[in-house]
Amino acid sequence: MADVAKFLDRVEGSLNRGREIDRILSSFKLNAYDVLDILPGMSVDDIRNLYRKKSLMIHPDKNRDNPKAADAFDILKKAESDLVNDKIRESLDSAYTAARNQLLKEKKLSPNSEDVHSDQFLFDLKVRWREILIADEVARRRARQLDLANQQREQARQDEIARERKRRVESEKVWEETRDNRVGNWQDFLHKTKKNNLKKKNKKPRVLG
């Protein structure tokens, strides 16, 4: 009987681990709170403790028969890293507060209203929170693309300046290298011109008649 109980415990544990793995994989990856299935308000130490429990639960070594365990573990690890990062956590908290305030205003509820603690309000809050985070991510990506485009244009401008400088240096180099030839040609031209002028000057005019 004891063996049966142990077997059932193992089956239940395996099912729970599988459900947690699937939950993590289907969570909203831009929101580390959603990955850990918590809301803002927990201390960093509590977040770390929760992460340790969940990571042990879904660790690939304990779920060798589940090929999705490794991906879920990586996602969970990143979420924990995000939430112990003050800047990222504060950004998520700010989006959460904005979503909550928007809903309170739209639904004309006070922060102490019983409806604020209802499942429906929590569902709506998570949806609005998600929308805000998506909008923020889109804005960040556009800003990065714009910054990249500006960098590429500046790089192209600098490259053109460098090419023009190189052309000018090469042109000046050729000019210097051909100086002697130009001087020689000019002297030859002057000498030839002078010689022709002397010929014309010494040439007797033809007598008509």
Curated annotation (Swiss-Prot):
Cited CDD domains: DnaJ
GO cellular component: nucleus
GO BP annotations, alphabetical order: mRNA cis splicing, via spliceosome
Chain ranges of the J domain: 31-96
Region (Disordered): 149-175, 187-209
A Pfam family per the record: DnaJ
Name the UniProt record assigns to this protein: J domain-containing protein spf31
Organism: Schizosaccharomyces pombe (strain 972 / ATCC 24843) (Fission yeast)
Organismal lineage: Eukaryota, Fungi, Dikarya, Ascomycota, Taphrinomycotina
Gene name as annotated: spf31
